């Protein structure tokens, strides 16, 4: 009998809503009785309104959730949470993009570092190649001379080989008609003749018993040198075989001459037995020829090739045997486990050998890396030293440029100094001397005319005194190096400095003007002495007379005027000379610095880069 609608709803309510187990569910008869009894309305109400605890919690939660969602604060909070989540997502995306950019920048930095390292390696290799090329060029230049010598020796040996291939024929030993002898025979004959002369010159003084050295010793040395030169020329120009044949020919010729002399003197014929060595003893001592040695070498090569072919055939046989044994082992190992064990053992042994090889290779690579690191450190240290040296060279070049500029300025000042002195002399001294010269000539003419009226008066001392051998001072100052002891003119200058009481190290630029002034004073005093002596002679030889006295007074007055004029001129000259002498020490210092240190532009009184010349020299 089928269940009614109420019964089905009650059964469904018990099963689904209350989750009653199948064993505890009521039977159909019980459900029918409950629905047909007075409690049917009650069960209908229960089915509609009674729910399980779980469903009640769900309903309550749903009600609370809907109330929670309807709250505007909750809506605002949810919107803010969504915004925060969105911002977090965007921030995460930005962080990811930044990480990607950082990775890309790191990759670019790594690539740039690798590129720079490759550039440095390339530059280093280029420098190494340049250094190696320079070394190769130097080695080539160093090998040019040995190569040239070897080429010359090779040409000489080729010429000697070509000459050795040519057979030299000598004529008969005894020939009545003169024949044209070969060049080698003439050279050997000349060498033997020089050797004979040398021995004769060497043995002749000993045979005479003389022990005192004489000019013959020089003759012996000369003959010895001639003989050595001829032998060297002979060995250089002719092969050894030709020389030996020429010597044998000369020996035979000399033997025939001795025989003829013995026969001519009526002596008995004596057999000149030559020590002929047996062929059996000499055959073993004869060196093999080059052809024989080459043949022996090729025979040895053929034997080795034959042995190689035999060894290759034996290797092929052993290889085939090994393959057969491997196939037999595979055939005998029918079990899969044993075969796997064998394969695993073989694989293990192969992997172990490969591991050992890789370990050895890793050790080699580690050692190579260590060596490369050491080499890199050395190269970095060398690079640092090269950079420091380059900086030092640049500083030195800058200093040299400054010194060259100062040097040119000093040269300009030095070139202007003598010109200024010469211009001063031309402006001051030359006009004064030209002005004094007519007056002196006029006075001399007056004295000569007056002397004609007094033939008995000796007026020679009154005439101007000319010193013989006195030469004007040179316009070019002597060098300061003339006081050096090795200079031929230094002895006279040093003696003059000792005589004048000046220090030994005094420069000749200061010594010569002082000596010239003292010499002029000496000449002036000698003139005065001669004048006084002449006056005394005139006074003692001639009778006193007014005319002579008046003449002498006139002469004295004129002489005084002349002396005054000359004194003024000499004072002016002395002032000019003093000024020139005051400038001489400065010129001396300039010239000394210029000649002793031509590459230095700094002078003693000048400062170059905060240093004086002695400080620069000390540095």
From Swiss-Prot:
The modification N-acetylmethionine is found at residue 1. Keywords: Acetylation, Cell cycle, Cell division, Coiled coil, Cytoplasm, Cytoskeleton, Microtubule, Mitosis. InterPro entries: HAUS5, HAUS5_metazoa. Signal peptide: none annotated. The keyword Ribosomal protein does not apply. It is found in: Cytoplasm, Cytoskeleton, Microtubule organizing center, Centrosome; Cytoplasm, Cytoskeleton, Spindle. It comes from the Eukaryota. Residues 73-108, 310-395, 550-590 form a coiled coil. One of its GO terms (cellular component) is centrosome. Pfam families: HAUS5. GO terms for biological process: cell division; centrosome cycle; spindle assembly. Component of the HAUS augmin-like complex. The complex interacts with the gamma-tubulin ring complex and this interaction is required for spindle assembly. Interacts with EML3 (phosphorylated at 'Thr-882'). Belongs to the HAUS5 family. Contributes to mitotic spindle assembly, maintenance of centrosome integrity and completion of cytokinesis as part of the HAUS augmin-like complex. PANTHER family: HAUS AUGMIN-LIKE COMPLEX SUBUNIT 5. This is HAUS augmin-like complex subunit 5. It comes from Mus musculus. The gene is Haus5.
